[in-house]
Structures are given as structure tokens and as C-alpha cells.
Amino acid sequence: MKLKLLLPIIFFGLLSTASAQSLTVATYNLRLFTASDTGNLWVNRAPVIAALIRYHDFDVFGTQEGYQNQLDDIIKILPQYQCSGAGRDDGKDKGEHSAILFKSDKFKLLNHGDFWLSQTPEKPSLGWDATCCNRICSWVYLQDIKSKRKFYFFNAHYDHQGNIAREESSKLIMQRIKTLAGNEPVVLTGDFNGDRSSTWYQRIATSGWLKDAYTQVKYPYANNGSFNNFGSNVKSDEVIDHIFTTSNFKVLRWGLLTDSYHGKYPSDHFPITAQIELK
């Protein structure tokens, strides 16, 4: 009799464990490929970045600034990841990407897309008061192969100069997320070029349906700012890279990773990571 009573408890306990799988997500500005980075060249940084990703075991993560050759280098070292995202200059492979990488043995790619942070989001274009560069947001719709749970993952890189562009980017991204994802679980990552006091950050964080993962944990591992400028800005506490989630997720941990090698940093940004769980 006792065994009969215990079996349903064990069964439902196993179901609960399976449906509550945690994911390690992250956002990481890789720093673009440029020969002017004397002492911090991509050829030296790439294997360190790959080792960092492997060690911290990111399941899904958004990248910023990566050129196609940089993303190819990461995938070559870490073939367990699949990459999705278009180049911001031509919608194919030219220019910086806001690419998303995910473990191909853990997730099935159901859909994906890109849109530009501009008044003409369907084609490569400058937005509002931005004068330097096209800005792009990439997204994927993933299904966890084991649990069958589905979620959307969006990743963006905001303009570094135009205040109007950053404000409007937040509006556009939230509109697109609502249109594409509806009430489904969503993770939004990116380099927002603004800390938690910026109005474009606040527009998302106070929206009522997307919350900063940092604010959802009791003990965030926040030991620095996220832009280190290859070491010349390490005393800053300003975090401009963020992870947002909808209420479908429980945030278990949040951390800013300050890994270094031989006294150097693998990028001019520190990656932000969060352990999250679909409710």
C-alpha cells in the first residue's frame, strides 16, 4: 500500500524536475575585428573567448559586434553551437552581427529573423538620429529538445551616440516582441549602451512584462561595470549590457564575469550571464 502511494509522488516529482530545467543565458559584446587593437588582436582573443564560453557553459547567448569571420572562428572552436543572425550592413554576412549562439544538441531552431533598429526595420538602414552605423536586432524561436518547452530569444546592439535612436529602439523592440512572441516566454539580451538610469533601459525595465534579470535575484554577482575598454575602464560600476526576461522565467542567478588572461581581458566588455528556469 505504501509503495502504491509513493509511486504517484515520485512520478509527479520527476515530471516537475523535467519541466523545470534551468538554462544558462548570456550577453557578450565580442569587440569587432580590427587591426588597430594592438595588444588585443582577435587572433589572440578568440581562443580565450571560446574557452570562457565553454567553461561557463552558456546554453544560449547573444553576441554583439562580431563579424562573420569572428563568429566562424567561435563555431570552429565550439562546434556544439549553432549561430543565427544577419550582418547589419547587407542583411547577409557583411558588417557587425547581433548573432545568437545556442547548443544544437539541446535546442531545435523553429524560426528566426532579424530587423533593423530604424524607421524601416525590414531593410538595412540608419535609425533616427544615428549617424555612424546600422543597428540590428536578431531573434530565434527555440524548443528545448528534452522538455519540449519553447521560448523566444532576442538580441540587440543599440546606437552609441543617438539618444533618440536608443529611445526608439526600445519602443520598436518591445513592439516586435509583442507581435512575434505574444504571451510566450521571452529573453532579451544586448549591449544597450545605457545603464539602469537611462531612459531607454527604463522603458523596458518598467514595461511590466520584461524585467531585468539583475533585479530578480537576491545576490547578483555585480563586481564591476560591464564596459572595461580593455582595462582602462575597470573602475566603473556602470552596467550597459543587460538580460531581460518575461515572468515565464524564474531567475536563479545573475553574474558579471571578469575573466582575464595574462593580465588582459578577452573583450572590451565583460559578459553578463544568468541562470534561468522556465516556470
Question: What are these model-predicted stretches?
Answer:
Residues 4-15:
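Sec-dependent N-terminal signal peptides
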Residues 22-35, 98, 110-115, 149-159:
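Active-site-proximal beta-strand elements of phosphoester/diester hydrolases
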Residues 31, 67, 157-159, 192-193, ...:
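Catalytic metal-binding/acid-base residues of hydrolase active sites
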Residues 60-150, 255-256:
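Structured beta-strand-rich core segments of catalytic domains in phosphoester-bond hydrolases
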Residues 106, 164, 168, 175-186, ...:
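Metal-dependent phosphoester-hydrolase catalytic domains
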Residues 2, 18-77, 88-96, 171, ...:
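N-terminal, active-site-proximal structural segment of metallo-dependent hydrolase catalytic domains
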Residues 62-64, 85-86, 187-191, 212-215:
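Active-site neighborhood of phospho(di)ester-bond hydrolases with catalytic His/Asp-centered motifs
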